[in-house]
Amino acid sequence: MTVSKILKQVINRKTTRQIVIAQLGLGSLASLKQLIIEQLQLISDHRVTLKIFSQIEPNLHTFISDTELAELFSSKPNTSLSLAAIEGCQRIIVNDGKLKIDFHLGSYAQQLQQLPIVSSGFIDGWNMADNLAQEQLDSALFWQMAKLAHNDCLFCLEPTLTPEAQQQSLLLAEQVGLYSELPLKNDDTLFQERAALRAQSHQQQAPFPICPAALTPVENDIGIAIIGGGVASACLALSLAERDQRVTLFCEDDALAQAASGNKQGAIYPLLTPDNNTLSQYFQQAYLFSLQRLKTLAARGHKIDFDLCGVVHTGHDERSRKRVAKITHGHNWEPNIALAIAAEQASNIAGVKLDDGGLFYPQGGWVSPQDFTRAAFNQAQAISDASLKLNTQITGIHSKDNVWYLSSKTERFGPFKALIVANGKSITQYPQTQYLQATGFRGQVSHVPSRAKLSKLSAVLCAHGYMTPSNNDLHCLGASYVKNAADTRYSPSEQVENLHKIQHSYIGQDWIEDIDVSGHSARVDVRMVTRDHAPMMGPVPNLDAILALYQQHQLTPESRQFWQTHAAPTHKNLYVLGGLGSRGLCSGPLAAEALAAQICGEPMPISLDFVSLLNPNRMWMRKLLKGKALEMSGKS
């Protein structure tokens, strides 16, 4: 039975609109294309998520390089697919969110164990593909599959699966209650064991809680509020709109993307570390998702200035060259993510002379953050009830009966079933969010005219600062990085500093002489940065409640166990999306998609490791889980 046939059976019997089908094994390219075509033609209110669990195998590259599949995903010819053969989840969104395809690559067991449980069991059907890795099938794996499944989950085998694999799969499925030879048999004992496994997983998630909002029926929908106006909040509005949510975005400016998302050009490339740690892994998956968002919006006809011309990353002094070398050789990077290049290659790619080799990010490039922001929100308005309130500075927020109300100097808004604070440099302005651990850094980006040899620059350069190829006859370079600087006026000294960074990075190159900052053209704003450089996404921690519990369980032998097993307190139905730093174009869209999934109680496209990495309470909970002391001010 194919996934398409399973889906039809589930649609015929299910009343809820969200359907999740999971498949063990990559399956065939033809079957996946058939499913996408059927979903594009299907007139239905159902939203389908297909989760494909596959080891990283040679056939995967056939999927990644298939132009017809890429065109189906984006609805536009000559589009490349933003997928890479890396471990973890990569989400592709098709047909305005009516079909989501999650590729979970790597060990079956590891990928299943890392799935966050947002609600109870959520998988409606399991399909065993004919190219599954039979050697990975065992009882422990099938218990993981059963834990994630509804009790009435369908279990199906591809008819081309070998007889041995069929027999093994059916036997293991029967042992965990996924399959029975008797048509109406329900094994309550097995269902109880599956429920116990879910409860255990929920408890393991307790320190970094996943908190769906109490969503109301569509006919009684009071909507979701977002405070923001930049690329992250616009992408969040789009992700919520793809789930048929009613969204209101409150922006204090007279147009979208007037703050940190207002630069003329921003670079898109991942943050990599030599050991490819959790942060590095998140940035790779976020990078691919952001590229997919960008391409899809452009394919939909939204005007976005961008060029995925690649990014050349080199050192600028002995220390940074060693750092780049460590990143280059510390991990076997997938070629779609990063390639080691020599100086001659770097020069050929960049179109200007470079003396250093380094890393090349072939899918990266630059985009207009303003265009990206507007396109995301315009698309949200095109597919759902998304409204925008400009010139509306929200000065206060408060909750009553688990719904949220917002206040400006002249008006009151609400109720809203959920509220997301995503207003960049102002995320800490409310009493509920004042202790969120993110710091503002002023950044000035310089604009210089494109001329002479400088005009030949054909890739984004990243060394001590960055520089973009020209757009509308201007290059962007920068940016300055000044902590806690509230003044956002133009700085002549930072303009010169930006020039010196490029001069220092590419000493002796004649094209540097064509960089002219004397026009005093620049843009200044503040970006919020976290100590660990990870974005902040999830429920807002209730710090007063955390500190009250801390006083009761302070540094006792049992204190670590308490925090490991009790859900960390949060403000109900209040969330934050921020702390994106200087790479929000890369990290923001996936964080927004994951938050929208969490709010709506749907499968998240990130692992449990990423949930804890991004959780807004992480700085406090890391200490508590290690039995370390907190300062009672809450700012530790």
UniProtKB/Swiss-Prot annotation:
One of its GO terms (cellular component) is cytoplasm. The keyword Transcription regulation does not apply. The keyword tRNA processing applies. Residues 227-636 are annotated as: FAD-dependent cmnm(5)s(2)U34 oxidoreductase. Its cofactor is FAD. SUPFAM superfamilies: FAD/NAD(P)-binding domain (SSF51905). Residues 1-202 are annotated as: tRNA (mnm(5)s(2)U34)-methyltransferase. Its EC number is 2.1.1.61, 1.5.-.-. InterPro entries: FAD-dep_OxRdtase (IPR006076), FAD/NAD-bd_sf (IPR036188), tRNA_MAMT_biosynth_bifunc_MnmC (IPR023032), tRNA_S-uridine_synth_MnmC_C (IPR017610). Catalyzes the last two steps in the biosynthesis of 5-methylaminomethyl-2-thiouridine (mnm(5)s(2)U) at the wobble position (U34) in tRNA. Catalyzes the FAD-dependent demodification of cmnm(5)s(2)U34 to nm(5)s(2)U34, followed by the transfer of a methyl group from S-adenosyl-L-methionine to nm(5)s(2)U34, to form mnm(5)s(2)U34. In the N-terminal section; belongs to the methyltransferase superfamily. tRNA (mnm(5)s(2)U34)-methyltransferase family. In the C-terminal section; belongs to the DAO family. This is tRNA 5-methylaminomethyl-2-thiouridine biosynthesis bifunctional protein MnmC.
